[in-house]
């Protein structure tokens, strides 16, 4: 029996602002518990929220990146529920008039492109954090009031692989706008998943199950793979799917029942009386749009068409805005695009992974990387010497000056190399005889001897040309 899978995702993205959405408390990850709070965050009676204009502008940016329609007249609502990490007993969110709706992003799976619709995007405040330890429960309200956007997809996702691709495409586009760092390890991006299956040919959606607060795209994919299989087995055995909230166990790779939902939650939404509606006119939207940088898809096309990079290389370079900007700046400094791409993906990426640092936290700059690459292109240095130059750059040296100070300029002058070639040949008659007898490896040995005498500074291309001419003349 064949089944059709339907998946919807709700992605919560923490916005990168200096202060919270309705209070002046700072937004800082890793602070001492309850250090970044005030009376508004604590929900004291009589205190009033003040909307953060920067949050609305971040919402406009994100909506634009998601090709969404921006609501010109939007307002906030109260979502009523009680929990210790929510001291007001309600959350300020958007329900009736979210800031944006009807957007889309494009994904690619197995070489096939597909548009995934976005139902809506709304702004809301985050809740605090509960920690349970021994016989005590602790409440940390540092996160309370942190601005979020929640992006709700349409039920257009048809497989766990598509869900993974959607999350990755969404992460890239949001990160490129600069409204969030989307660091999942710090909770800046969390995903709620909904999945249902139905027999092929049926138009009626199946009963969905949900899993909340997944903080890894791999967990999103693995939880959906397991749940897809589980639901198929239940239906094929003649059972029925219940509407459930389940938890994904990272250790076992299984989903575990948390609770059965007999109906939809009633949060008794009503308009937030303490915050006026927000009117967003076309001029405001236009001014915000001007600050949005080139998106990853456009950059990938430019890298392929303008620089001749492969689709794979263009994809790697646009994984983050940081790397993409660095590449563009390096090429603007005169570096060969393909060499710049190779170094960023190779030596640079290996260094970042080994030392566990961000690119912008190193001594590498587009100027000094381009300086090294230009010396490779004009054969001032060899690729072998470039390895040493790269290490020197990462230790804080300027590449051109360092190469000159160390006397590592590549020797390319035939007039200076010919005597060295002759000397090596004079002392290696056996290798000359081997070459004349068709043993090509003799050439490699002779090149190695020449490179040894020049301490690796001889231009290999020139050496090979001189050597072959000299061998044939003997």
Swiss-Prot record:
It catalyses: L-glutamyl-tRNA(Gln) + L-glutamine + ATP + H2O = L-glutaminyl-tRNA(Gln) + L-glutamate + ADP + phosphate + H(+); L-aspartyl-tRNA(Asn) + L-glutamine + ATP + H2O = L-asparaginyl-tRNA(Asn) + L-glutamate + ADP + phosphate + 2 H(+). InterPro entries: Asn/Gln-tRNA_amidoTrfase_suB/E, Asn/Gln-tRNA_Trfase_suB/E_cat, Asn/Gln_amidotransferase, Asn/Gln_tRNA_amidoTrase-B-like, GatB, GatB_C_1, GatB_Yqey_C_2, Gln-tRNA_amidoTrfase_suB_CS. Its EC number is 6.3.5.-. Gene3D superfamilies: 1.10.10.410, GatB domain, N-terminal subdomain. GO terms for biological process: glutaminyl-tRNAGln biosynthesis via transamidation; translation. It is an enzyme of class 6 (ligase). GO terms for molecular function: asparaginyl-tRNA synthase (glutamine-hydrolyzing) activity; ATP binding; glutaminyl-tRNA synthase (glutamine-hydrolyzing) activity. Keywords: ATP-binding, Ligase, Nucleotide-binding, Protein biosynthesis. Allows the formation of correctly charged Asn-tRNA(Asn) or Gln-tRNA(Gln) through the transamidation of misacylated Asp-tRNA(Asn) or Glu-tRNA(Gln) in organisms which lack either or both of asparaginyl-tRNA or glutaminyl-tRNA synthetases. The reaction takes place in the presence of glutamine and ATP through an activated phospho-Asp-tRNA(Asn) or phospho-Glu-tRNA(Gln). Heterotrimer of A, B and C subunits. This is Aspartyl/glutamyl-tRNA(Asn/Gln) amidotransferase subunit B. It comes from Lactiplantibacillus plantarum (strain ATCC BAA-793 / NCIMB 8826 / WCFS1).
């Amino acid at each position: 029996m064949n089944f059709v899978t339907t998946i919807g995702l709700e992605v919560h993205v923490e916005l990168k602002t200096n202060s919270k959405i309705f209070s002046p408390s700072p937004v800082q990850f890793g602070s001492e518990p309850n250090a970044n709070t005030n009376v508004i965050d604590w929900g004291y009676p009589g205190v009033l929220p003040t909307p953060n204009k920067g949050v609305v502008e971040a919402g406009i940016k994100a909506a634009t990146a998601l090709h969404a329609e921006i609501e010109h007249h939007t307002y906030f609502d109260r979502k009523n529920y009680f929990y210790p990490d929510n001291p007001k007993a309600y959350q300020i969110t958007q329900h009736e008039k979210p800031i944006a709706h009807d957007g889309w992003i494009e994904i690619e799976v197995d070489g096939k492109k597909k548009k995934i619709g976005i139902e809506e995007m709304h702004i809301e405040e985050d809740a605090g954090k509960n920690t349970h330890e021994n016989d005590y429960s602790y409440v940390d309200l540092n996160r309370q009031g942190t601005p979020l956007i929640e992006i709700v997809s349409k039920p257009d996702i048809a497989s766990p692989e598509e869900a993974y691709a959607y999350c990755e495409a969404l992460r890239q586009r949001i990160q490129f706008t600069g409204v969030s760092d989307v660091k999942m390890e710090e909770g800046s991006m969390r995903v709620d998943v909904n999945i249902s299956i139905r027999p092929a040919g049926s138009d009626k959606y199946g009963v969905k199950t949900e899993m909340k607060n997944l903080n890894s795209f791999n967990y999103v994919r693995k939880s959906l793979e397991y749940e897809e299989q589980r639901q198929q087995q239940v239906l094929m055995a003649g059972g029925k799917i219940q509407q459930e909230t389940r938890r994904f166990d990272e250790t076992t790779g299984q989903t575990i029942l948390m609770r059965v939902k007999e109906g939809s939650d009633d949060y008794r939404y009503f308009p937030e009386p303490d915050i006026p509606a927000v009117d967003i006119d076309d001029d405001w939207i236009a001014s915000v749009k001007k600050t949005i940088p080139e998106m990853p898809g456009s950059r990938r096309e430019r890298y392929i068409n303008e620089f001749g990079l492969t689709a794979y290389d263009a994809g790697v370079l646009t994984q983050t805005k940081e790397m993409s900007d660095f590449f563009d700046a390096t090429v603007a400094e005169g570096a060969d695009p393909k060499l710049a791409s190779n170094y960023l993906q190779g030596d640079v990426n290996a260094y970042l992974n080994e030392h566990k640092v961000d690119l912008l936290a190193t001594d590498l700059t587009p100027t000094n990387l381009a300086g090294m690459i230009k010396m490779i292109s004009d054969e001032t240095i060899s690729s072998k010497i470039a390895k040493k130059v790269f290490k020197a750059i990462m230790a804080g040296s300027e590449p051109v000056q360092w190469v000159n100070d160390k006397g590592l300029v590549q020797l390319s002058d035939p007039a200076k190399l010919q005597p060295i070639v002759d000397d090596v040949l004079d002392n290696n008659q056996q290798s000359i005889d081997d070459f004349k007898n068709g043993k090509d490896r003799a050439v490699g040995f002779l090149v190695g001897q020449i490179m040894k005498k020049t301490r690796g500074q001889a231009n290999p291309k020139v050496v090979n040309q001189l050597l072959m001419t000299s061998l044939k003349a003997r």
